[in-house]
Amino acid sequence: MTNIRKTHPLLKIVNSSFIDLPAPSSLSSWWNFGSLLGVCLAVQILTGLFLAMHYTSDTATAFNSVTHICRDVNYGWVLRYLHANGASMFFICLYLHVGRGLYYGSYTYSETWNVGILLLFAVMATAFMGYVLPWGQMSFWGATVITNLLSAIPYIGTDLVQWIWGGFSVDKATLTRFFAFHFLLPFVVTALVMVHLLFLHETGSNNPTGIPSDSDMIPFHPYYTIKDILGFLMMLTALSTLVLFSPDLLGDPDNYTPANPLSTPPHIKPEWYFLFAYAILRSIPNKLGGVLALVLSILILAIVPMLHMSKQRSMMFRPLSQCLFWLLVAVLFTLTWIGGQPVEHPYIIIGQMASVLYFLIILVFMPLISIVENRLLNW
């Protein structure tokens, strides 16, 4: 008799996606981050659901409701810190996942890549709105500064900002709508994940060599399920350690002060995972120019497939491109550090140099070095 997993209308979808799925035999641990992101999303939706049961999206009570969750709700502090640090884990996995795609040339699957970019924007929007909800000082001022950037859009900017705020400043209407969207967006992200997987399974996975692996495939289960479970355990161990030993390591102390529109914090900055983009924004003295650079710092991923000049797909056998890739990683770390520093000498000039280098590496150096490598191999 045929196995039920191969005949049942629902189970056969699961079977063809996670059990009998043909996968390249050479996938390294860099291919674990897709499944880790799935676990992160599940953790965020579950903890967020329970937090939403106790949270109130009103400026008068939001800060106190978060305090109430931490002090009075059974294991509320675990939920709150799992959710806050889970976001950090989410972004660590996201950036490593995108980095893997850049290194191994996975961006040549353009549909999967473009849906991935949409996912990145959706997750960033969700995280930004979530940061506003505790209604601490950094929540309030972060929301004010970042939403105010839209006023740089010519003609409609000011009206657009007031429309998003629901008034003439960040207030109760803003908090309520941010909570509504923060609750809704993870489900949009989940739907996009399904589209992402649908496109991926149309083409099959890439592999470290970048060479078609149709002749050497193995079933996803048990080989990659067991490998993914090891990844889950390692990530959840790291997350638990962070939550139980130093839950505020990645947060901002200013957010333990209730929001006060009359007192500006000495240094307004977003969460650590947005600092690289924030540094690029600040490095341009013009407001509209800064906003464009901020958007382009992520949107540049969409034109990476067009800039692929190499005859090889992966960077595995391209040492010159590898050097440039790791230089790009170093530049991103530098930008993250600069984004957390005050706007003063020498941080301003370092930020400007790193921002220029970031765009130069992706737009100019990578394509040029690929052409050089082709010539060296007489291609």
UniProtKB/Swiss-Prot annotation:
Molecular function via GO: metal ion binding; ubiquinol-cytochrome-c reductase activity
Protein location: Mitochondrion inner membrane
Major subcellular location class: mitochondrion
Cofactor: heme b
Residue numbers binding heme b b562: H83, H182
Membrane topology: Multi-pass membrane protein
Binding site for heme b b566: H97, H196
Transmembrane residue ranges: 33-53, 77-98, 113-133, 178-198, 226-246, 288-308, 320-340, 347-367
Keyword Magnesium appears in the UniProt entry: no
Cofactor mode of binding and number, as noted: Binds 2 heme b groups non-covalently.
Pfam families referenced in this protein's UniProt entry, alphabetically: Cytochrom_B_C, Cytochrome_B
Keywords associated with the record: Electron transport, Heme, Iron, Membrane, Metal-binding, Mitochondrion, Mitochondrion inner membrane, Respiratory chain, Transmembrane, Transmembrane helix, Transport, Ubiquinone
InterPro entries linked to this entry: Cyt_b/b6_C, Cyt_b/b6_C_sf, Cyt_b/b6_N, Cytb/b6-like_sf, Cytochrome_b, Cytochrome_b_C_euk/bac, Cytochrome_b_N_euk/bac, Di-haem_cyt_TM
One CC-aspect GO term: respiratory chain complex III
Record-level GO BP terms: mitochondrial electron transport, ubiquinol to cytochrome c
Binding site for a ubiquinone: H201
Function: Component of the ubiquinol-cytochrome c reductase complex (complex III or cytochrome b-c1 complex) that is part of the mitochondrial respiratory chain. The b-c1 complex mediates electron transfer from ubiquinol to cytochrome c. Contributes to the generation of a proton gradient across the mitochondrial membrane that is then used for ATP synthesis.
Family: Belongs to the cytochrome b family.
Other comment: Heme 1 (or BL or b562) is low-potential and absorbs at about 562 nm, and heme 2 (or BH or b566) is high-potential and absorbs at about 566 nm.
Quaternary state and interactors: The cytochrome bc1 complex contains 11 subunits: 3 respiratory subunits (MT-CYB, CYC1 and UQCRFS1), 2 core proteins (UQCRC1 and UQCRC2) and 6 low-molecular weight proteins (UQCRH/QCR6, UQCRB/QCR7, UQCRQ/QCR8, UQCR10/QCR9, UQCR11/QCR10 and a cleavage product of UQCRFS1). This cytochrome bc1 complex then forms a dimer.
Name this protein carries in UniProt: Cytochrome b
Gene, per the UniProt record: MT-CYB
